[in-house]
Regions:
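ABC ATPase NBD coupling module
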Residues: 52-68, 94, 101, 216-220
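Conserved ABC transporter NBD signature motif
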Residues: 43-52
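A short, surface-exposed alpha-helical micro-motif characterized by mixed small hydrophobic
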Residues: 192-194
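Conserved ABC ATPase signature
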Residues: 126-130, 134
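ABC ATPase "signature
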Residues: 210-211
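Helix-to-loop junction immediately C-terminal to a conserved catalytic motif
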Residues: 35
Length: 238
């Protein structure tokens, strides 16, 4: 899906922005474009203030290392030949970060625990033996290994049950509370409002509505946004 007239920015220091829309709306394209994973044909894309189309590949790699990226498909993302713990540690090794192996392993275990994975048997297993939901949580831990300034998540809770989904969002919000900014893609407006202070609603590659999450949920202006809200499952009465 090509993007058309999309203009948005995300501040540092713990800002969180959710991109919402149905399949094919351009959400994943926008996310991948933000870190230069899709060739830029027109327009301007800046990452940490630098125009991506103007910088050499080595500098782009350095910029990307300041980001964590969680792709939509966890099945093809994790290295198949590595154990879970090694897969989480791998970004530091690739980046040349110097630290004792035991310390690196402990750091990886702490990150996995943030997303509810604490079983040593899981740490030792390979990604191919995990469920989709477990793989998503491993991907989140892996994306945080380098302590990113910006985390980009593409439907990171799509394979979770409701309880685990909430725990993951809470963990991510703790991270934004510590200063990490986040760009979060989802088809679920309610989840978006929980994850981020601001929402952008995409349809057919265009922004049809944007603003504070609370305002959009309580007073949607665009018919498409209204339809997305009406399609949400009703919350149980208490």
């Amino acid at each position: 899906m090509a993007l058309n007239g999309v203009s948005l920015s995300l501040a540092g220091g713990g800002a969180a922005l959710a991109i919402v829309g149905e399949s094919g709306s351009g959400k994943s394209t926008l996310l991948r474009s933000a870190i230069g994973l899709i060739p830029q044909k027109s327009g301007s894309v800046k990452l940490f203030g630098q125009e991506l189309k103007d910088i050499p590949a080595r500098e782009l790699t350095a910029l990307r290392r300041r980001c964590g990226y969680v792709p939509q498909d966890p099945y093809g993302a994790l290295p198949p030949g590595l154990s879970v713990i090694d897969a989480v540690m791998e970004p530091e090794i690739i980046a040349g970060v110097k630290r004792p192996k035991a310390e690196r392993r402990e750091r990886a275990k702490e990150l996995l625990a943030e997303f509810g994975l604490t079983d040593e048997r899981i740490f030792a297993s390979r990604a191919v033996g995990l469920s989709g939901g477990q793989r998503q949580r491993v991907e989140l831990a892996r994306a945080l290994m380098l302590g990113p300034e910006l985390l980009l998540c593409d439907e990171p809770t799509s394979m979770q049950d409701a309880s685990t989904r909430g725990e993951i969002i809470e963990a991510l919000r703790r991270r934004t509370g510590l200063g990490m900014s986040m760009l979060f893609v989802t088809h679920d407006l309610r989840l978006a409002a929980f994850a981020a202070e601001n929402i952008v609603v995409l349809k057919d590659g265009k922004i049809c509505e944007s603003g504070p999450s609370r305002e959009i949920m309580q007073n949607p202006q665009h018919p498409y946004t209204q339809a997305l809200i009406e399609a949400l499952p009703k919350l149980p009465e208490t």
